[in-house]
Curated annotation (Swiss-Prot):
Any one annotated GO CC term: cytoplasm
Record-annotated N-acetyltransferase domain positions: 457-637
Annotated residues for binding of ATP: 228, 256-265, 412
Record protein name field: tRNA(Met) cytidine acetyltransferase TmcA
Predominant location category: cytoplasm
Record-linked InterPro entries: Acyl_CoA_acyltransferase (IPR016181), GNAT_dom (IPR000182), NAT10/TcmA_helicase (IPR007807), P-loop_NTPase (IPR027417), TmcA/NAT10/Kre33 (IPR032672), TmcA_N (IPR013562), tRNA_acetyltr_TmcA (IPR024914)
Keyword Ribonucleoprotein recorded: no
GO terms under biological process: rRNA acetylation involved in maturation of SSU-rRNA; tRNA acetylation; tRNA wobble cytosine modification
Length: 801
């Protein structure tokens, strides 16, 4: 006997029958505080539609690290109809099944309502399928501290300080949307029914195949949509040799449009065709994570199987495909950074919007045929900012033949799916900034803008249009966004928002900020010993690396993210936002404002222009962006100024000694900017007579640099540390950074600085002579001559100046 009344069961069945006709999905949210009732209710609903699900897979996802989560999973497993095939997957392993398609998915969200989990799971169910969410009662949900939220409670805050706007937004959106129902398992009643949903039958249009093509019909037959056929037709162009110009394909789509599988079909055919033409083919595949490219590999393998290739599939320890091997064919995943060392006939860059534009162009330099694909809206979406940042610049590149295509038809379900609409709305996956008109540009030019502190409850729960403007700027401007960014913004007690608006109210700059510091003695000591302090990134790094406990007592604001509307960039709005933030911070007794970011020349210049001082750089590059993370701080109080001055001087000395390793591959321009923006101080020349003799023989005679590079290194460090220094050109300073401080070969130095060997060696000799005059007071070969011929009696003293 089912726990749920029969009429309630039939309502879900009728709704699912209707959904199957229209190839749309439904979401049933079951709430309850009794675990047994919660699971039994879910099973009752599943039993009543089991004939609609039989023969197809069902996903059950849960939090394996919670004993009650494991217990609910066991209850479900014992009660589920035997004829259903169920995959039980813990959330931390969900990436492993993202390429699979399910008829239904049960998501246990009792322990953790995490935005990323929702973003990932909402794409796996096919049209006509059912999602079931298991949740505590909404009252208890707003009192429970989830696993996601527990990581947001940083020192100085308690669970009572959690803002809980994400949970409130979740409840609001569940109650607003059609196709979503809420059932109270404890009291057995509908909190909300599915509402009016379309029941128009949907049949996917049969793709129209090309009359003539190098690609056989059997490959085209694997394409499910016309979009996928069009992508394959573009791949046909990539069979030609890239002789006079590079071949580039930029493919974009919302999530769930079959983008990666279409690329896989094209890669499989091209690998087969090139192998037949020239005996071998190597395809390099990259993405921020190997999980992003599983569909590329699966569909490439399917096409190779069509052509009777014996394919060996290599997987990593987590079961992710990393390589396909066949006779004369290799399709391999490499990390974005390692692409710069790889070679191949074709490069495929999936989720390209998550990789910085400079790195994408470095990849293009290395390969003659490149496919860049990226999600516009969805879990890994980057909005249309990718097109703005990348395509605009790509179109200005000479020697590039560019193909573009945007896919629109969903693969797993019909267009206008209500559950896709709900997901996009809840997680702001399709948020875009406001449109900027000529009148708006006039307001910017006239300085008619203002700094605003929004009411966050109003913004997150009521002012939907303003929230979409605010968050849309981040999607448009930043490399990587995921739903957890939104969750942190909405729930973290130490995070707060500011914005710059035009006089007419439009949002043009978005700032997400975090209060940090005020740690006290004990926490500061823990950090100094190596403990990781949650939510205090700048104090934690500075105390860890410089051991000055006093910094932990200061209060600061970290700029988590600052982004300007793309249509009004370069007009001083970001700097205006920072200046107003600093004024607000001073009024409220803060000691500093700071930021951490993946360092590029342009970004560093922005922060330096606004008076921020570099104080730390990570020793490792980010594996996706290929950038080092730099921390900058602007002291506001006198105490902060004293501490930051000491730390910045130490950072400068540390950097001078670290450019050969670990910062060997840091761009010389960035290194130079860091060195010139940190404090200089009084230093003395301190050379032995023999060091002096070698240096002067190099400067004024015929000794080679290699024979005195140790002394040139001393003099170079002296130059960058010293307050009183001679005037060198920027090229000469870059030469010192690359050749001396980073210890690069002449070949690499000349390549980086676009110099001939003769120009580089001549400039280095000039630098040595300038150092000789300014630091040592030796102005010519005649004056240096007395150091060329030494006796033992001359060696008693060193040289100080």
């Amino acid at each position: 006997m089912p726990l749920v009344p029969l009429e309630h069961l039939d309502e879900v069945r009728e709704e699912l029958v209707k959904a199957r006709k229209s190839r749309h999905r439904r979401l049933l949210v079951i709430t309850g505080d009794d675990d047994s009732r919660l699971v039994t209710t879910a099973l009752d609903f599943i039993y009543n539609v089991k004939d609609l699900l039989s023969g197809e897979k069902v996903l059950y996802t849960y939090h394996a690290f919670y004993s009650d989560g494991a217990m609910r999973k066991e209850l479900f497993e014992k009660g589920v109809p035997r004829e259903l095939s169920v995959d039980y997957v813990s959330y931390h392993k969900l990436d492993e099944v993202l390429g699979r398609t399910y008829a239904a998915a049960v998501a246990d969200l009792v322990n953790n309502l995490e935005p990323n989990d929702l973003g990932r799971v909402m794409g796996v169910v096919e049209g006509g399928g059912l999602y079931i969410f298991l949740l505590p009662s909404f009252t208890r949900l707003l009192e429970t501290v989830t696993r996601f939220q527990s990581n947001l409670i940083v020192p100085g805050y308690t669970d009572k300080d959690l803002k809980r706007y994400f949970e409130k937004r979740f409840i609001k959106k569940v109650m607003e949307h059609q196709g979503v129902a809420v059932y109270d398992a404890d009291n057995r009643y509908w909190v909300k029914k599915f509402g009016k949903t379309p029941s128009t039958p949907y049949a996917r249009p049969k793709p129209v195949l090309p009359q003539k093509s190098k690609i056989p019909v059997k490959v085209f037959n694997l394409a499910l949509t016309q979009d996928q056929v069009e992508v394959l037709k573009i791949f046909e162009h990539f069979y030609a040799k890239a002789e006079k110009e590079k071949l580039v394909f930029v493919l974009t789509a919302d999530r769930g449009r079959g983008k990666s599988s279409a690329v896989g079909l094209g890669v499989g055919w091209l690998a087969h065709r090139l192998r037949r033409a020239k005996g071998k083919c190597k395809v390099v595949v990259t993405a921020p994570a190997v999980t992003n490219v599983q569909e590329v590999f699966r569909f490439s393998a399917a096409v190779l199987d069509l052509f009777k290739h014996k394919v060996e599939v290599l997987e990593d320890e987590s079961g992710m495909i990393t390589k396909l091997l066949s006779k004369g064919i290799e399709i391999e995943y490499v990390t974005p950074l390692d692409v710069l060392k790889a070679k191949g006939d074709l490069l495929v860059v999936d989720e390209a919007a998550s990789i910085p534009v400079p790195l994408l162009f470095k990849m293009l330099k290395r390969f003659n045929k490149v496919v860049y694909s990226s999600t516009i809206h969805g879990y890994e979406g980057a909005g249309r900012g990718f097109s703005l940042r990348f395509l605009k610049r790509l179109k200005n590149e000479e020697g590039v033949k560019l193909y573009e295509y945007e896919m629109s038809e969903p693969i797993r379900y019909a267009p206008e799916d209500p559950i896709e609409k709900w997901t996009f709305d809840l997680l702001l996956l399709d948020a875009e900034p406001c449109e900027i008109t000529e009148d708006d540009l006039s307001l910017v030019s006239a300085g008619e803008v203002y700094y605003d502190a929004p009411n966050e409850e109003e913004l997150f729960l009521k002012n939907e249009e303003e929230l979409r403007q605010f968050f849309g700027i981040y999607i448009m401007a930043h490399y990587r966004n995921n739903p957890n960014d939104l969750g942190i913004m909405m729930d973290a007690p130490h995070h707060f928002l500011r914005m710059v608006r035009l006089k007419n109210g439009k949002i043009v700059v978005s700032l997400e900020l975090a209060s940090e510091g005020n740690l006290g003695e004990d926490l500061s000591k823990e950090s100094a010993k190596g403990a990781w302090l949650m939510g205090n990134i700048i104090p934690d790094r500075l105390i860890k690396h410089y051991k000055i406990l006093d910094f932990g007592n200061l209060r600061g604001i970290r700029v988590v993210r600052i982004a300007t509307h793309p249509s009004v960039m370069g007009k001083g709005l970001g700097s205006f936002a920072l200046s107003r933030l600093e004024e607000e911070a001073r009024r409220n007794g803060y000691d500093w404002v700071g930021a951490g970011f993946g360092v590029t020349y342009e970004l560093l210049k922005f922060w330096l222009k606004n008076g921020y001082i570099p104080v730390h750089m990570s020793p490792e590059k980010n594996p996706v962006s290929g950038e080092y993370t730099v921390i900058v701080v602007k002291p506001l109080s006198e105490k902060a100024k004293r501490i930051v001055d000491v730390i910045a001087k130490e950072f400068k000395q540390k950097l001078l000694g670290s450019l050969a390793s670990p910062y060997f591959d840091l761009e010389p321009e960035v290194a130079l900017l860091l060195l010139k923006s940190t404090p200089s101080f009084e230093v003395k020349v301190n050379l032995t007579k023999l060091q002096l003799a070698r240096f002067l023989t190099y400067a004024w005679s015929d000794m080679t640099l290699e024979n005195c590079i140790d002394v040139v290194g001393i003099m170079t460090r002296l130059y960058f540390l010293s307050k009183k220094k001679p005037s060198l050109s920027e090229l000469q300073e870059l030469l010192l950074v690359s050749k001396i401080l980073q210890a690069k070969s002449w070949h690499l130095t000349c390549q980086e600085l676009n110099l001939s060997l003769a120009e580089a060696t001549s400039n280095m000799k000039q630098i040595a002579q300038i150092f000789s005059k300014e630091f040592l007071g030796v102005n010519s070969e005649e004056e240096a001559l007395r150091y060329f011929f030494l006796r033992m009696d001359d060696l008693n003293e060193g040289v100080s100046a």
